[in-house]
Amino acid sequence: MEARIDEGGEAQQFYGSVGKRSVEWDLNDWKWDGDLFLATQTTRGRQFFPLGNSSNSSSSCSDEGNDKKRRAVAIQGDTNGALTLNLNGESDGLFPAKKTKSGAVCQVENCEADLSKVKDYHRRHKVCEMHSKATSATVGGILQRFCQQCSRFHLLQEFDEGKRSCRRRLAGHNKRRRKTNPEPGANGNPSDDHSSNYLLITLLKILSNMHNHTGDQDLMSHLLKSLVSHAGEQLGKNLVELLLQGGGSQGSLNIGNSALLGIEQAPQEELKQFSARQDGTATENRSEKQVKMNDFDLNDIYIDSDDTDVERSPPPTNPATSSLDYPSWIHQSSPPQTSRNSDSASDQSPSSSSEDAQMRTGRIVFKLFGKEPNEFPIVLRGQILDWLSHSPTDMESYIRPGCIVLTIYLRQAETAWEELSDDLGFSLGKLLDLSDDPLWTTGWIYVRVQNQLAFVYNGQVVVDTSLSLKSRDYSHIISVKPLAIAATEKAQFTVKGMNLRQRGTRLLCSVEGKYLIQETTHDSTTREDDDFKDNSEIVECVNFSCDMPILSGRGFMEIEDQGLSSSFFPFLVVEDDDVCSEIRILETTLEFTGTDSAKQAMDFIHEIGWLLHRSKLGESDPNPGVFPLIRFQWLIEFSMDREWCAVIRKLLNMFFDGAVGEFSSSSNATLSELCLLHRAVRKNSKPMVEMLLRYIPKQQRNSLFRPDAAGPAGLTPLHIAAGKDGSEDVLDALTEDPAMVGIEAWKTCRDSTGFTPEDYARLRGHFSYIHLIQRKINKKSTTEDHVVVNIPVSFSDREQKEPKSGPMASALEITQIPCKLCDHKLVYGTTRRSVAYRPAMLSMVAIAAVCVCVALLFKSCPEVLYVFQPFRWELLDYGTS
């Protein structure tokens, strides 16, 4: 949570000479409409004003200095409950006057060693030097040992005898050492890509700290000249001239050496060598990456200059970065865009719908240096749409401090994404030509689209390059669990990814235009083997919790690595627990990245996310048009294939709420054309059939789906079930509909050829179906002959209250309302009712006749003439002979 200045707080120092504000803007002070791209300042008890002649085009932008200022002060009496970005990783609402390191103690029980004067490494990991090398220590009531590679405590069983690192990290370290060196890139020198990205990190760092010092523009010139040397010598010359010409402008560079180096002074000659030796080569000899302590901060960036860990920093990969005067963040590798969820969770997964052009959801990131939300023009959304030629079908935005980081999620055609990223510099030129707003034409702007990035200075594109490093060198998200959460519960997230704990990594959680406060949990990070990636990579898991402020919508989990690499992953917020449980089935599928099933699953999450977002906006949705019916149909088909009853019900509810297509009186007919009940019968899904038969839309009285609804060729669901094998359960459900039209339609409903469902069953030899329906018909007719009599519960009380006018009744009299039809049956139906007893009488007569015959046979003396003597029953013997 970001702290703010209290009115009674200590006066701050202003850099009036360079026109900077005292503190960075606070996310709590602004209400951002992510759909209209409008920033509205909230009513606060404290307002910020610049000193003197401070300019609106430049403000404090330090990710380090201002972060310390935010942590050094606190606002009192703030009970508005606004959601803010937890930049410093604290979950408490108030902070001490200044965050110092004097209070750090060893985490080992009964140690309490003061870590204020020890090395930064021991301070960050909260372990004293003695226990970091001890063979055992008690932490959390468990005997453990500190791992030198993981920089955290493990159980003793995870260590081999005499080893200071756990077996898992040693195994990964040995595998990396045995791997052969990668083949050179297309330019013949793979270290050039590393050097370019180090320069980009340095440039971003300078721009974020340009308020700290004044003078000296040579540093920026050297960096940019070296950065664009790969693109051409002439571009570098033009860039330096551009920077020199802008020296007296409002957005001129005021940069000091310490802004780059993170120390008090640094030799300028080192920078010249850094620029001159860009073409040099060096063998790659990288050590194990540095990792943080087990309770690492989800939102903080550990790149403070005083926290630089020289002894654990990896050796440089290029002689140009070999000086130890540079902080460790200069030597770190920056990630490429190789994963389908880096910059876009579906960058490699086009939509599976049958639209004319394949669509994809991605994002564009703008970092506007020296700007504040009040400088956003009212027509910002229109400017973005004009720049993109109105190609996005859906668009949503977020802002957060760090000057201003404007993140735009949008859905547009794959060809539009390719056109935008293939020549980002030309595309940005169109944006700058279309608008003369100071937001775009003054100061520095950093733009990121997929693996392309660009820098804009005073309305001109000065850098346009791409990132291309191995995936093991950057952070990205593999999966987020749960994929769908109920709005009524506290969200407990588990984020799985690569290099989540490396230096300079931030994990952000955003929902419907807002960033949420993340509460860290102790021992939340674990490492496990990755079964679907290269064995040299290690999968890390981060657990944290946060409160969901909405009932329904879509959110994103974002990871950011020093401004160069970024990755995001969508998740859903739904009020129905059954919907959440069904969508969570996709969690396992999404972990197998690169497969067709994973691509389709990610498309589904994006599409239903946009639908939930539009359904939440309602009539205030600024996106052009309505949610197309063809996209809705693809969502229905995807859910129907997986037999998700709750998801289908949710989609139908949103359809009748008007979130899909042009809702009118013909919407029922439009939905009937999808033949959902026919699809469910073909899937042989009895739960889906039962749900559809009992689904009644809002503000309607009758069921929408009927078992006698005619589809293609006049086929009804009954026809389909009668012709399929093993459809007893589905047929049973179809004939148990609320209106009981299924039984009637079994023998009366005909297709285009004149056959009934019963005829289909006879032709296919499904006589069990016929017997099943016949039993139901017989049961129905028998039930209709019975008369239900309502007998009072307390009849004795009624007798006591009523006076007895005559002798005590010997029988219960049931009064019945006169009915002509009943009287008619009583008069003319006596003979027919007596026939019901005729079979019993005949049976009794037959039994009596048999008994008489047997008796006569026993008492008579039958004679068999000419063969035997007269036969008598009394003379009959028994035995074997």
Swiss-Prot record:
Cofactor: Zn(2+)
BP GO terms, sorted: regulation of DNA-templated transcription
Binding of Zn(2+) 1, residues: 106, 111, 128, 131
Domain remark in the UniProt entry: The SBP-type zinc finger is required for the binding to DNA.
Chain sites annotated for binding Zn(2+) 2: 147, 150, 154, 166
Gene encoding the protein: SPL1
Record annotation: effect of changing residue 166 to A: Complete loss of DNA binding
Region of interest called Sufficient and necessary for DNA binding, as start-end residue ranges on this chain: 96-187
Entry GO MF terms: DNA binding; DNA-binding transcription factor activity; zinc ion binding
Listed InterPro entries: Ankyrin_rpt-contain_sf, SBP-like, SBP_dom, SBP_sf
Cofactor info, note text: Binds 2 Zn(2+) ions per subunit.
Compositionally skewed regions (Polar residues) per UniProt: 275-284, 319-338
Species in which this protein is naturally found: Arabidopsis thaliana (Mouse-ear cress)
Cellular component terms (Gene Ontology): nucleus
Motif (Bipartite nuclear localization signal): 163-179
Protein origin, superkingdom: Eukaryota
Keywords: DNA-binding, Metal-binding, Nucleus, Transcription, Transcription regulation, Zinc, Zinc-finger
Any Pfam family hit: SBP
PROSITE patterns: ZF_SBP
Bias (Basic and acidic residues): 285-295
Protein name: Squamosa promoter-binding-like protein 1
Zinc fingers, SBP-type class: 103-180
Region annotation (Disordered) ranges: 49-69, 170-193, 274-358
Subcellular location: Nucleus
Biased composition (Basic residues): 170-179
